Amino acid sequence: MEGINNFKTPNKSEKRKSVLCSTPCVNIPASPFMQKLGFGTGVSVYLMKRSPRGLSHSPWAVKKISLLCDDHYRTVYQKRLTDEAKILKNLNHPNIIGYRAFTEASDGSLCLAMEYGGEKSLNDLIEERNKDSGSPFPAAVILRVALHMARGLKYLHQEKKLLHGDIKSSNVVIKGDFETIKICDVGVSLPLDENMTVTDPEACYIGTEPWKPKEALEENGIITDKADVFAFGLTLWEMMTLCIPHVNLPDDDVDEDATFDESDFDDEAYYAALGTRPSINMEELDDSYQKAIELFCVCTNEDPKDRPSAAHIVEALELDGQCCGLSSKH
């Protein structure tokens, strides 16, 4: 690949009603009666088992607004959850989590029900691996995740003209031994124009700080589909390093039993590193990782024009399982 070798408002009640009216009546239990699967900013995700009258139905993952949110943030998260429901309902792709319902629970909180097949987030798997072996995921697994994520992003970008806006390991769910790989949490997605650019002046790129590209950190940065590609590259980096981008803990020569103190965190270095490509310890990765490293590097080029599109990543990865030959001009 050229360049790859060189890398050293409507009324809220009305809005809610319009979404809920198209959803059949669903009885969502109160939070204490469901198993908690995880949580995010302002929301929690629960397992809802559905077996009425002795019938067996597939379970759902139910995302609910946290009851602990104050009124201001509750309004923000309610809008975000409503937006996510409206977007998710119109998506249909094997690498995007499926919509099931949007309604209110018995405690009055808004709920988004999604498909659930026993998945864990990629972030959970990274944390588990860090505690167990501490070794990177096999290169073949990383490339499999890359292909399935790229297919989901290609669908969002090309067919739905949507920027996901918050790609990271926490927003990828995995079933079993990487049998299925799906992107979730489309609540901060932004519309793309025909040039794959976010042009809506009211649109605000949310993202999550360590995964943000340089253009999203600039005051007048132009956001395109390549913002997702940058965060996608950092997600592959997470699988190779088992770390959060740019959040550097003490050096390896520090006593393993030593407690990490918040005062040890270098704020200045962290903020200076945001939007850049984090380094990789090449001594920990053998030759089998070369393709994954190349893909990570080209996706995290600072200039968005030098990153491949999701469609081109898919094309390259599907060609005999190879990812060499990626051009940075797509």
Curated annotation (Swiss-Prot):
EC number: 2.7.12.2
Quaternary organization: Interacts with DLG1 and TP53.
Residues bearing the modification Phosphothreonine: 9, 23
PTM remark: Phosphorylated; in a cell-cycle dependent manner at mitosis.
Endpoints of the signal sequence: none
InterPro entries, per database record: Kinase-like_dom_sf, PKc_TOPK, Prot_kinase_dom, Ser/Thr_kinase_AS
Residue list for modification N-acetylmethionine: 1
Protein kinase domain mapped to chain residues: 31-330
One MF annotation (Gene Ontology) recorded for this entry: MAP kinase kinase activity
Enzyme class (EC, first level): transferase
GO biological process, one term: negative regulation of inflammatory response
Protein name: Lymphokine-activated killer T-cell-originated protein kinase
Activity control, per UniProt: Activated by phosphorylation.
Gene behind the chain: Pbk
Role, per record: Phosphorylates MAP kinase p38. Seems to be active only in mitosis. May also play a role in the activation of lymphoid cells. When phosphorylated, forms a complex with TP53, leading to TP53 destabilization.
